[in-house]
Amino acid sequence: MIRSEILSKFREENPEITDRVLTDAAAYSWLEEGNREICAITRCIVDQDGTTITTAEDDDHYDLSDKISKFADIDTYPGGGVTYNDKRIEEKTIAQLDHESSSWRSRSSGTPKGYYRRGKWIYLDRSIDSNEYDLKVYAVLIPDDFNDDVMPFNELEYLETYHYALIYYLQKRAKMKIGKTGEEAKALQEYGSYLKWMKKELGGGKYTEINYTKHNGYK
């Protein structure tokens, strides 16, 4: 469905939400917000082949929002993650790195085996000792603006099945605006259940994130 069709379907199924209650202009603004929210929750917009980051000797961190257009997060599900020299490296926490070696911050440069995140930054567990190999990051992306009469979710045809999520989003927002007892909670529950199902169908619920269990109990 294109944007106008989504709004028409919403009004058809919610006749009490007239234009006096919710103007088309306000609904279109909500749809743009909903497009961003749904993509963020379901992580449905991902890059195709990952982004190659050219490395230099002694590099130990990178600004991912600078290196990757519309970067939202690292895609940590199977087929994603971060690789160095085409080998996957582990995501860790600073606490895990401290547990493994209290002197990791001062270790000599070499081949990174892991990384940790700080917001938009990715930090390697050691600085790189050569510019011979590249880092590759597979990312979840921020969707394109949904401000025209086109399909949502970057107009990706394989996501057309899930356009109904935006009808549930409009319904949730409208019921919250009206404030009828019981209806607001029901609309919120329906929206949440749909997104949970959508994420599962897209893969986030079928596969778990890749982690490696260590003998010391840390992952």
Model regions: which residues?
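Glycine-enriched, solvent-exposed interface loops adjoining structured elements
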Residues: M1-K219
